[in-house]
């Protein structure tokens, strides 16, 4: 039986909120089978628990934001992406601010934290959402689509007309049957443009953004002294984001994701469209390992890590 997973022990870290610029303490705790991933604002007079769910995503302008009863937890996508990559089904996530810390702008720090805590199997079948028919959402020239596929693969095309991005490639495809999330996706950093950062700061946002946690571009080049971690790091980060955005559906997806210029908002619309059509998906488990997609077999790699 392909089983659910959580972490073995509590682990915590401190980082900076990308938009608030404030210090955030993040604590990850083991959770029982069938809990899902539950975020808790422990800094509020009465702690508010917000389970990760497609319907709980509110604001998506600059990040994926979970909302409930007036409480928010922002920028959840990188941590959710790491959980997906390592096959974590159940986890308590405690934060003392309204943002998950940005760390280095990728999912690598969260992968390290989760691996440091240890990952253990639980005595319950891992549930998957299998895409049964194609679902597509569009917004202008932007597109996001899920298609039936026995595994998990993603194809993403970006369209940033910028010399530094043009040089690295605007399209990337990955099939986790034969590719490692930790090696090929987790280290890809978020990126932004210097003129946009200035405008965001005037709005009280991006106060924690720096060359330490993002790739920053001016009109012509990259401002960071550090080299790119991947030749096509920009589009790989978009895939990292998409994996995290899709994982708020509550279970790993068995299907293929195709996107053109998609973002957090369109990704969430795609999940809602999928869930709204009961003929488009089914929840499945695998009693026999040999019946499961290779991408999710633990003897190959944890989840698709």
Swiss-Prot record:
GO biological process, one term: lipid A biosynthetic process
Positions of Zn(2+) binding: 78, 237, 241
InterPro entries found in the cross-reference section: Ribosomal_Su5_D2-typ_SF, UDP-acyl_GlcNac_deAcase, UDP-acyl_GlcNac_deAcase_C, UDP-acyl_N-AcGlcN_deAcase_N
Enzyme Commission number, as recorded: 3.5.1.108
Pathway named in the protein's UniProt entry: Glycolipid biosynthesis; lipid IV(A) biosynthesis; lipid IV(A) from (3R)-3-hydroxytetradecanoyl-[acyl-carrier-protein] and UDP-N-acetyl-alpha-D-glucosamine: step 2/6
Gene Ontology molecular-function annotations: metal ion binding; UDP-3-O-acyl-N-acetylglucosamine deacetylase activity
Keywords per UniProt: Hydrolase, Lipid A biosynthesis, Lipid biosynthesis, Lipid metabolism, Metal-binding, Zinc
Cofactor(s), by name: Zn(2+)
HAMAP family: LpxC
Family of the protein in this entry: Belongs to the LpxC family.
Protein name, as recorded: UDP-3-O-acyl-N-acetylglucosamine deacetylase
